[in-house]
Amino acid sequence: MASGAARYRLSCSLPGHELDVRGLVCCLYPPGAFVSVSRDRTTRLWAPDSPNRGFTEMHCMSGHSNFVSCVCIIPSSDIYPHGLIATGGNDHNICIFSLDSPMPLYILKGHKDTVCSLSSGKFGTLLSGSWDTTAKVWLNDKCMMTLQGHTAAVWAVKILPEQGLMLTGSADKTIKLWKAGRCERTFSGHEDCVRGLAILSETEFLSCANDASIRRWQITGECLGVYYGHTNYIYSISVFPNCRDFVTTAEDRSLRIWKHGECAQTIRLPAQSIWCCCVLDNGDIVVGASDGIIRVFTEADERTASAEEIKAFERELSQATIDSKTGDLGDINAEQLPGREHLNEPGTREGQTRLIRDGERVEAYQWSVSDGRWIKIGDVVGSSGANQQTSGKVLYEGKEFDYVFSIDVNEGGPSYKLPYNVSDDPWLVAYNFLQKNDLNPMFLDQVAKFIIDNTKGQTLGLGNTSFSDPFTGGGRYVPGTSGPSNTVQTADPFTGAGRYMPGSAGMDTTMAGVDPFTGNSAYRSAASKTVNIYFPKKEALTFDQANPTQILGKLKELNGSAPEEKKLTEDDLVLLEKILSLICGNASEKPTAQQLQVLWKAINWPEDIVFPALDILRLSIKHPSVNENFCNEKEGDQFSSHLINLLNPKGKPANQLLALRTFCNCFVSQAGQKLMMSQRESLMSHAIELKSGSNKNIHIALATLTLNYSVCFHKDHNIEGKAQCLSVISTILEVVQDLEATFRLLVALGTLISDDSNAIQLAKSLGVDSQIKKYASVSEPAKVSECCRLILNLL
């Protein structure tokens, strides 16, 4: 920035909070307002004074039983035209406030540890990040899905609403991109905990971390730039209205303003931890710090503080103390520093820091280009010469430390050495000490308290009444340490043309000529296009096609390859033949227990030869007595686990296909339906792994499984189950090419959102509407475009 350009100066200081200000966000109403949250357990709304500068506390809200860590604004709706305020706390809860009540409208419970980050999207969706290593997606007062994948606390979350994408940043040093509940990409590059995220555009975002760096990313994965300037943990980042420039705050007591990719201005504050910041619509910057004061900085002359207020701020800043051991000012050797005459020389850049010696004191000054002078930013404490004798350091394993403690964990046991510098975080040191010596993590509080008690008066950032670390202010967080598919031809996916083809003829139903699922690709609806004949689907869809002669022939052929202990006898083969005859002939007779025992024996054949037995199971499971036998509460878990194991992406495509079709057919009876619902999360998470292959039959089976779950959820309105199905639908639509699979996914989608406004909003938030628009122009088969247009009318 040129020296003549406008500089940010203090506009006002806002006392009110009694402890650290941990979060800030611009508010929708009144215009120009913002919301703050604090460790004092309160949330406060600040409205601008008119016409120029200053803010007044308009509303104070309470609801958390512990520190409040983060805040965001939920956009306006018909019911709440001024939007809602969401806050997350150390009590594991999220409180939702309106502007007309000091108490929460409702509280979201579900996280198992501190909620430390929030972001809102369209249609009432909310994304939360927690120390419990998860992020959760909420719609109104319900949890829609949980994002699992990080190995440490999720410190930062952001929603990119236009694409239905979500970002999470973690103490495991990574950032993850999520779509429809699934991790699509992991960004690696930061060398320490990721603390903040900010959106630049639909394709780019920024991140900041404890490694004192800021990174600019494309959502495709490329890191476009790394920015350095801070000398300690960076806690927050906020973007200007131009969506290009940004501001950051950090543990180095500074607010930094970045323009055109460079640090254009550094503003020091009289507090150690500058926890949070936000940029108002008029370009003013609001910051919150560990001293409980909110400060606003502006470029506008009409909103700049009076000369007396600026002098008072500079006086407060000059009286602050800076510990030399934080490293914020570089290596300091007091004996080699110049005297006050050095301040007669002008600085070379905005924010340049200069240290001078005044008798026994070391003072820190910062150059202000706009004022053309050096401004004192504090007295440096703890500065000394550079040798061990003058510094009072203790050598341990070749390194210098302020302290080396002997820790006795067990009486009579060995003692452990614990090296510590006063610039270190006591909780992190305690954590690393326990990890290094393989000690029980339950000792964390005890060891950290030992460090704090024995370094009182010298440990950075600690008050007299609480144990606070620069990660959280709460003193309890333990940060993590560094941390094939084969193409299958339609004619015969398994054994060759003209041979046994399990289920290759596709779908049959008892209502041929009426149900659009039963027609081939030339199907046309006889009804008017204004009449919806596609969804909601009321009954499960099954795979019925069979050729018993070919199935038995293949079974007998492969029986010779089975291990001796698993070979079927001639009597066994006769029993299986009777099952097939009974099932395919629609006889009223029930399969016997002996027949079902032989079938169980057959489906436990080795994976290379088991597929004909699975095909018999696929057909048999539709029979009520067979369904009850395999899907009852006693046998169901073992049965489903066996089939789920066959869904291994590295397994045989024939087994994958027939296992999926068997699961689809389980839905026809009450016992099977109950089992499928109880196994939903495990089954769907394994089944979705098969989406990446090119086998269209597997895609159709996967779509049918999702459709059958949708039928169940349409009946009982399980919003969590609907969320998982919507996620699966969105994920499969990204890769599927077969139009029959696409059609079934569309019917599943329509069934899920029919008569359910919450499901409609969730589908919108996932970007499903934009995802399916391309199918509205499909000409063959017509059922695809007709179904798609009906869904778009709902969305």
From Swiss-Prot:
It holds the Pfam family PFU. One of its GO terms (biological process) is positive regulation of neuron migration. Keywords: Acetylation, Cytoplasm, Developmental protein, Neurogenesis, Nucleus, Phosphoprotein, Repeat, Synapse, WD repeat. It is found in: Nucleus; Cytoplasm; Synapse. It comes from the Eukaryota. One of its GO terms (molecular function) is ubiquitin binding. The keyword Acetylation applies. ARM repeats lie at residues 546-588, 589-620, 621-669, 670-715, 716-755, 756-795. One of its GO terms (cellular component) is cytoplasm. Plays a role in protein ubiquitination, sorting and degradation through its association with VCP. Involved in ubiquitin-mediated membrane proteins trafficking to late endosomes in an ESCRT-dependent manner, and hence plays a role in synaptic vesicle recycling. May play a role in macroautophagy, regulating for instance the clearance of damaged lysosomes. Plays a role in cerebellar Purkinje cell development. Belongs to the WD repeat PLAP family. This is Phospholipase A-2-activating protein. It comes from Rattus norvegicus.
